[in-house]
């Protein structure tokens, strides 16, 4: 948890230092790969049903470091040159809890 690393604590998961730290932890890459694969499978069904939006949530204790870095990496992996049913995938990360820390 970057919260316990003094030089990372004041930064967010949007900074390269925190993002690199979070994404290099054991199991994180596999978790993100599994999550993005699930999203791609779900998306096909959503399209068949005529739905245009999927909302995903990623959370952690403080909402400042881990969830921010992981959500942004999910956006990067899901949108990077990907198409679904011939349509480009558009994704965005909304970091609800950034700025709320005490």
What are these regions (language model features)?
Residues 52-75:
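Catalytic cysteine-centered active loop of the rhodanese-like fold, especially the PTP/DSP P-loop
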Residues 24, 71, 85-86:
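Serine/threonine-rich low-complexity intrinsically disordered regions
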Residues 84-100:
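Short beta-strand-centered segment that lines the nucleotide-binding/catalytic pocket of NTP-utilizing
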Residues 50, 64, 86-88:
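Recognition helices and adjacent regulatory flanks at domain boundaries
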Residues 74, 78-82:
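Hydrophobic alpha-helical packing residues
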